[in-house]
């Protein structure tokens, strides 16, 4: 499958029975063949010993408006691919990969249909990999565990330089010299665990998905019912990093607003007292968490056209 402008190609294969995918940009590899699949509790992984049962292609080209965003209206234009698979060995479980190719990236997700037996699905982790074609320069936010404030410095390190035990937050920005800038992230998370990334093994350019564990059952990440769909796994792609900022790819992958009437929503700039703490210049009161400071901030916002406090 290719993007509407033909620059991006996504290929899904079952070489040797293992479900895999690869991505190229302008004819150059971005992601080498990378493993797909789900690791299930008390069951073999879902994604090995698979064969393609059917393939369906389509396209989307629509526009919509949003209360706030980078551009308005937003155009949602992509080519779509749905690959239905089934195991070649018993119990012949089924899996569908739904994918989209945009001019600014690709996305895919897992769909697990009813299997005809128990409809509960218990996911330990995903087998999803991102095998970068080069030892790219990355700019990760390294987290100490799955419960953090997400406040730390972004680093500059090659893929092979990421410690195998480091937990990488998304989005992850990477520069593949001579090929593209990419950002790995996710979209449409609903009734599913958040995804992080970890370095596969030392000296490898492969990153693997890590799902946040459940608090009540730490050995599991997702407990839900079939039919089930995962969030989108997103690879944003551009020749320049600024194009990633301009992209509407993630919002296009998210579902439409559940709020039918958005006319009452008035977006605007907002001040927040934590931004400046208790600091205020040339005032006749003691700055701090007090009424005088809040009134000072409100007056500042009024004078400078800042709508909210």
Over which residues does each language-model region extend?
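An acidic-aromatic substrate-binding cleft motif
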Residues: 225-308
């Amino acid at each position: 499958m290719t993007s509407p402008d033909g620059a991006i190609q996504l290929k899904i294969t079952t070489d040797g029975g293992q479900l895999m995918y690869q991505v190229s940009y302008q004819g150059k590899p971005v992601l080498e063949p990378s493993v797909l699949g789900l690791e299930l509790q008390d069951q073999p992984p879902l994604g090995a010993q698979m064969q393609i049962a059917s393939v369906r292609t389509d396209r989307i080209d629509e526009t919509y408006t949003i209360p706030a965003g980078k551009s308005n209206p937003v155009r949602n234009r992509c080519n779509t691919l749905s690959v239905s698979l089934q195991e070649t060995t018993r119990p012949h479980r089924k899996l569908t990969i739904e994918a989209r190719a945009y001019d600014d990236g690709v996305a895919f997700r897992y769909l697990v249909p009813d299997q005809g037996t128990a409809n509960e699905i218990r996911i330990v982790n995903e087998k999803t990999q991102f095998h970068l074609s080069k030892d790219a320069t990355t700019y990760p936010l390294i987290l100490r565990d799955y419960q953090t404030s997400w406040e730390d410095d972004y680093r500059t390190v090659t893929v092979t330089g990421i410690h195998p035990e480091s937990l990488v937050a998304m989005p992850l920005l990477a520069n593949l010299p001579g090929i593209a800038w990419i950002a790995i992230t996710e979209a449409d998370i609903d009734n599913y665990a958040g995804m992080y990334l970890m370095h596969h093994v030392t000296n490898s350019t492969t990153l693997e998905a890590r799902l946040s564990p459940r608090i009540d059952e730490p050995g599991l990440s997702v407990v839900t019912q079939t039919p089930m769909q995962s969030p989108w796994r997103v690879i944003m792609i551009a020749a320049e990093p600024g194009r990633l900022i301009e992209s509407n790819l993630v919002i296009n992958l998210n579902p439409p607003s559940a709020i039918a009437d958005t006319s009452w929503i008035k977006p605007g700039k907002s001040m927040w007292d934590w931004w400046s703490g208790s600091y205020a210049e040339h005032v006749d009161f003691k700055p701090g968490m007090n009424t005088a400071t809040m009134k000072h901030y409100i007056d500042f916002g009024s004078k400078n056209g800042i709508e909210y406090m």
